[in-house]
Amino acid sequence: MFSDDIFLTDNALERIQKEYDFQFTYIKYQGDVPCENINTALNHCEGRIIKPMFSDDIFLSDYALERIQQEYNKLGCKWAFSGFSNWNGETHDKKIPVWADKTLEGRNLLSSPTVVSFLNECKEEFDVNLKLLLDVDFYHRMRMKNGMPNIIPNILVANRDHDDRISSQATSQYDCVVEHPEGNWMMNSKELHYIHQKYPEFMINPKYPDES
C-alpha cells in the first residue's frame, strides 16, 4: 500500500509498474485530509498482508518485503514492526522499535506507520480527529485487538526527515509538556485531552489484555 499526500505529475506509478512488471490498483483519493487518504487506501487493500509506505519514505533492502512476509509465517503473528532508520539525506540514525509506557500519550519509540505491517483481517482505521497522536492511537487499538506486535530486528525502512514532512509541520501545534522520569516531551493539549476522553479506563489502569 503506497500513500501519497501530494498530486503526482511525474508518472511515478507507471514507471514503477513498467520497471518491476507487476499489476497494481491505483485508487486516487480526491480530498485533502491525509488521514482519510490512508484510510481510503486501507479500505481498498485486498492482499493478506498490508504494508503501508508513504511518499516520504523508502525501503532500505531489496528483500524488505520478503523479510516481512517471513514474519507472518510464524504462528500467531498478526502485526509487526520492523527496524528503521531516520534519514536526513546525509546520515542514518538506525533504531529498533520499542513499546514504551505512555506510548498512547505520545512517547512514541515505535516510529511512524511506515515501520508497521499487519494482516488485512486485523487492520484498524486511523482516527481522523488526530494528527500528532494519530499513529500511537492506531497502535493502541491494534494492540487492544490483536495483542503485542512482533518486532523484526532488521533495519528495513527509512523515515526521510525534511521540512515538508507532515510531522515536521505539526510541531507548531505543541503547546504542553508531558513529564516522564526518562525524559519529557512536547504535545498538543487538545489531542491529549481527546485521548484521555476516548480511553478513560485505560488512562486509569494502563494495562493491555496481553499483559499478565
Feature annotation, model-predicted:
Residues 82, 99-185:
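Conserved nucleotide-sugar donor-binding catalytic segment
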Residues 47-58:
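Short beta-strand-to-loop acidic/aromatic patch adjacent to the donor-nucleotide binding site
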Residues 6-7, 57-59:
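Acidic metal-phosphate-binding loop of nucleotide-sugar-dependent transferases
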Residues 1-28:
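Acidic donor-binding segment of Leloir-type glycosyltransferases
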Residues 63-93:
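Conserved donor NDP-sugar-binding/catalytic core segment of glycosyltransferases
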Residues 22, 45-48, 65:
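Active-site acidic short loop of glycosyltransferases
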Residues 11-12, 38, 61-68, 138, ...:
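Acidic donor-diphosphate engagement hotspot in glycosyltransferases and nucleotidyltransferases
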Residues 28-45:
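Glycine-rich, basic loop-to-helix element that forms the pyrophosphate-binding segment
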